[in-house]
Amino acid sequence: MEFLSSVFQPIVDLMSTLVTYAFQLTQMIGYPSYGVAIILLTIVIKAVLAPLTVKQIKSMKAMQELQPRMKELQDKYKNDPAKLQAEMGALYKEMGVNPLAGCLPLLVQMPFLIAIFYALQGYPYDQNYVQFLWLPSLGEPDPMYILPVLSALSTWIMSKQTSSGATGAAAQQQKIMTIFMPLFIGYISLSFPSGLVIYWVVSNVFQ
């Protein structure tokens, strides 16, 4: 974890500065709030990364539409891996689909996601404005466990929306992940700073 933090430190510093700027904006409009600042910054980040997100979703949908034909090829050439690979490549070329295209947007987004994670996890809040709604401190976990529940629920909804419609073993694995990931995110949110969990929930809402 410390290694990741050091590698992405320049972007972490940038994100921390953006949180400060967003907070200063809330001061200018007469409602100083780190909670509002985090929400505003999250929306801005999602807007900036929107083209990549759209590209990723389109790629996933294209792969989903190819699932029936891919299944046919897998059944037909299950004993001939070389032929299967050649036919799959021909199918991708025919339909203009790159199976790796959906990964690139995610890889581009990862540094920013990691950076905002570290920026909010250790952000030096002004203690005069660290309270938000029912939360006594954005730098501490939610004592009422509302945010962990919201993080799990929003992650589950996002997982359902982005499911690829896979079949067979892949479908079973996808079903397991759809259950596991929300529970995992909800669990780790129990110990994460509330400000960070707010970012995650809002990010899922605007996915």
Model-assigned labels for residue ranges:
Residues 1-207:
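Helix-loop-helix
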